[in-house]
């Protein structure tokens, strides 16, 4: 294979190169290498990573996500919305509500269609996992990490840990513009307490239904948005008594807004945009 067709899409500026594996079938042994290549802003297309839209024996489509460092992720909220848009618009599905398989399990997506195009997608992200063993954290166990003080070098932060199929640690901050992403993000991501690494979020509370959010993503660094991170931030806000279950929480990310609702049935709903940037052929 010397080339393949791709579609670049983004959810609130969190951009990936999407490859339709129903048609292209990139070789398994080269996926990490290709993800690194296409993600480069200098010698590739430029993105936060690569997402494959694959056949599935459990759902109409399966999503596989590769970060820009070549590592494979388990889940991606912004990616799910874009996969849903792609699947509907390219007639991989016919219904407006359908399942998508991920490495974290099955999720349900519902697309809002206008003139044949999808602009807004709601995804049922499932139930958050809160125990240290589920995150995972090194000390394991069934305890939760809620409003817990942790030391990272000489810096102490108070955080809440949430898994949305991938691990997150959420820290409150008084001024989101002062979030120490570049200095503490890579340190916390690779802290030995988190054996699989972790996504790092700083959150400023405006009120019980409005949060400002910045993220350092595991394997990608600073990004414009993180859908699972926004879900984790809303869940953490509820766990810390700031927000309530079963209410819409608007999360302001660098790339735009997501609406998150942690329902009484335990499921977290995420609603936001998905956009196509361009299509083309990539030469290997």
From Swiss-Prot:
Subcellular compartments: Cytoplasm
InterPro entries found in the cross-reference section: DAP_epimerase_AS (IPR018510), DAP_epimerase_DapF (IPR001653)
UniProt KW Cytoplasm keyword: yes
Site residues by UniProt (Could be important to modulate the pK values of the two catalytic cysteine residues): 168, 217
PROSITE patterns: DAP_EPIMERASE
Gene Ontology MF terms in the entry: diaminopimelate epimerase activity
Pfam families: DAP_epimerase (PF01678)
Family to which the UniProt record says this protein belongs: Belongs to the diaminopimelate epimerase family.
Protein name: Diaminopimelate epimerase
Organism: Bacillus subtilis (strain 168)
Source taxonomy: Bacteria, Bacillati, Bacillota, Bacilli, Bacillales
């Amino acid at each position: 294979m010397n080339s393949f067709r791709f579609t670049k899409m983004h959810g609130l500026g969190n951009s990936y190169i999407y490859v339709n594996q129903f048609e292209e079938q990139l070789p398994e042994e080269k996926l990490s290498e290709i993800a690194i290549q296409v993600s480069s802003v200098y010698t590739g297309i430029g993105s936060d990573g690569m997402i494959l839209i694959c056949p599935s024996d459990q759902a109409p489509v399966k999503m596989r996500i590769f970060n820009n460092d070549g590592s494979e992720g388990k889940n991606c909220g912004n990616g799910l919305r874009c996969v849903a848009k792609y699947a509907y618009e390219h007639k991989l599905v016919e219904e407006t509500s359908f399942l998508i398989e991920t490495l974290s399990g099955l999720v349900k997506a519902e697309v809002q269609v206008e003139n044949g195009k999808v602009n807004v997608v709601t995804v049922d992200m499932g139930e958050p996992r809160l125990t240290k063993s589920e995150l995972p954290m090194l000390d394991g166990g069934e305890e939760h990490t809620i409003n817990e003080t942790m030391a990272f070098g000489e810096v102490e932060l108070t955080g809440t840990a949430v898994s949305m199929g991938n691990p997150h640690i959420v820290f409150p901050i008084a001024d989101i513009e002062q979030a120490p992403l570049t200095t503490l993000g890579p340190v916390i991501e690779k802290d030995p307490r988190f054996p699989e690494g972790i996504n790092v979020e700083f959150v400023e509370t405006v009120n019980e239904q409005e949060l400002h959010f910045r993220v350092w993503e595991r394997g990608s660094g600073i990004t414009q948005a993180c859908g699972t991170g926004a879900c984790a931030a809303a869940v953490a806000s509820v766990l810390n008594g700031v927000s309530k279950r079963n209410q819409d929480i608007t999360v302001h990310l660098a790339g735009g807004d997501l609406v998150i609702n942690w329902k009484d049935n335990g499921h977290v709903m995420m609603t936001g945009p998905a956009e196509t940037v361009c299509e083309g052929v990539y030469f290997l």
